[in-house]
Amino acid sequence: GASGQALLRRLATLEQQGVEALFGEPALQLEDILRTEADGRGRIHLLDASRLVHEAPKVYATFLLWLLAELFEQLPERGDADKPVLALFFDEAHLLFADTPKVLQERLQQVVRLIRSKGVGVFFVTQSPADLPDEVLAQLGLRIQHGLRAFTAKEQKSLRAVADGFRPNPAFDTLTVLTELGIGEALVGTLED
């Protein structure tokens, strides 16, 4: 029926973006990225997806959803732990949500929300928080915001929204601080005091 046709169209789009090359790659083993040193220290793994992000963003989003879903399914519940089992940093995170089908965005948001209980920290790195969906921003336990500049009315509105995302602090005006931060300086906000 209609849903079958929609699925075929989506598969055709992924195929046009080169998804078959992704399936031809050696399998990513989660044990490899979860392995620690003998003294308990973690390892750093860099997955360079820069080409994939720009040439096939839907394939990139699909891969990340698969990775997060696999971690969610395979890792046991941990609750609040002293240190995470894994920390994932997604650079150019706005590309995960730009032009991605709504159903994929919703699934990404759901998995990101639930995966914290498995000991996985997810960090979204982007030039502007306004580029991320409100549903994702609402889940952030930690915000590290470098200085923002706003020249147009749209940028000023976006800046106010970013400032409003921080808990109020009587010691300073968040909006002013965000525009005055220098190179290497950042405003840090947490859910807890």
Map each language-model feature to its residues.
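P-loop NTPase motor domains
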Residues: 1-110, 179-182, 188
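Conserved ATP-driven motor cores of ASCE-family P-loop NTPases powering translocation/secretion/packaging/pilus
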Residues: 110-192
